[in-house]
């Protein structure tokens, strides 16, 4: 028999939007490192690309250059994360390589009742994620 992984008060069917308000929680993140870039769809593409390039180049003064960065994308931002990594690689004239890993992330949604007679509910859903390592290679 299939194991029920849903927490207490979990939702299995669609609920009436008049009865509940959907609140999507932020996904859990690992402790942030200086060379981690979390890509989203709200920030401008050129700004995210410039931030990645700045980390790889070491900023305006050339200090603290990272030999590798990790670009993380979740859901709709996967495409943008891939595009950023490919733009970095294309602009590096062969000095950068990329390695991608995919995963599935569990996200938790909270359903808050509109009336006091109902209990708050939670819903777990899965979303795809990508983690791209962009790193420098030594020329041969």
Swiss-Prot record:
Q: What is this protein called?
A: Ribonuclease P protein subunit p20
SUPFAM superfamilies listed in its UniProt record: AlbA-like (SSF82704)
- One of the protein's GO biological processes: rRNA processing
**Gene source species:** Homo sapiens
Keyword Cytoplasm attributed: yes
Subcellular location per UniProt equals: Nucleus, Nucleolus; Cytoplasm; Cytoplasmic granule
Q: Which Gene3D superfamilies match?
A: Alba-like domain
- Main location per the UniProt record: nucleus
As for what it does, the entry says:
Component of ribonuclease P, a ribonucleoprotein complex that generates mature tRNA molecules by cleaving their 5'-ends. Also a component of the MRP ribonuclease complex, which cleaves pre-rRNA sequences.
Give the record's family classification: Belongs to the histone-like Alba family.
Q: Which InterPro entries match?
A: Alba-like_dom_sf (IPR036882), Pop7/Rpp20 (IPR014612)
Phenotypic consequence of residue 40 to Q: Strongly reduced interaction with RPP25
Q: Name one GO molecular function term.
A: ribonuclease P RNA binding
Q: Keywords for this entry?
A: Cytoplasm, Nucleus, RNA-binding, rRNA processing, tRNA processing
Pfam families named in the record: Rpp20 (PF12328)
Cellular component terms per the entry's GO annotation: cytoplasm; intracellular membrane-bounded organelle; multimeric ribonuclease P complex; nucleolar ribonuclease P complex; nucleolus; nucleoplasm; nucleus; ribonuclease MRP complex
